């Protein structure tokens, strides 16, 4: 994970590689990245493609915050991470957003988030503190084995 660190939010390939290494796709399914680098603070927006079930929302938002902390720690000039996600039809089909700034991430982990990306040891300490390692997903893909595992039913 530390090897995927990049100094620049404007390096789209490096940021996407880092996001994949962080596990954004494993956590939330298919996604796109939009980078706002025309002026500071630079932002990385994740646009999640699959809808989320309401009962998974709280846990998913916590994972978004954890993923954002890792991104903010490992992209030197990144100032915020934003998320855009949909709820399922039975949860009002709404599009919602979440943003975490570097300052908010620092408060979340209790120290300057940028220092958490200064060394593999500092990164590992943050990951352990965040209880980061997870293999659960929060998204719904209609008609897949994943639906059966989580007892989901998608109503579109």
Predicted regions and their residues:
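N-proximal, solvent-exposed amphipathic alpha-helical segments enriched in charged/polar residues
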Residues: 1-43, 51-53, 122-156
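A short amphipathic beta-strand at an alpha->beta junction
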Residues: 72-95
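An exposed acidic His-Trp-rich patch
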Residues: 87-128
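A short interface-forming secondary-structure element
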Residues: 48-61, 102
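Hydrophobic beta-strand segments of well-ordered beta-sheets in folded domains
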Residues: 41-46, 79-82
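Short, non-transmembrane amphipathic alpha-helical segments
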Residues: 56-77
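Functionally constrained cores in energy, signaling, and assembly domains
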Residues: 11, 65-67, 84
């Amino acid at each position: 994970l530390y090897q995927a660190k990049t100094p620049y939010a404007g390096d789209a390939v490096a940021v996407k590689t880092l996001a994949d290494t962080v596990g954004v796709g494993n956590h939330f399914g298919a996604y796109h990245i939009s980078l706002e680098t025309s002026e500071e603070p630079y932002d990385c927006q994740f646009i999640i493609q699959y809808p989320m079930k309401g009962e998974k929302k709280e846990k998913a938002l916590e994972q978004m915050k954890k993923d954002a902390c890792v991104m903010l720690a490992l992209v030197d000039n990144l100032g915020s991470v934003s998320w855009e996600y949909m709820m399922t039809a039975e949860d009002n089909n709404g599009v919602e957003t979440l943003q975490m700034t570097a300052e908010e991430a620092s408060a979340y982990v209790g120290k300057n988030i940028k220092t958490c990306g200064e060394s593999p040891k500092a990164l590992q300490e943050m990951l352990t503190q965040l209880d980061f390692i997870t293999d659960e997903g929060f998204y719904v893909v209609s008609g897949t084995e994943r639906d059966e595992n989580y007892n989901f039913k998608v109503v579109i």
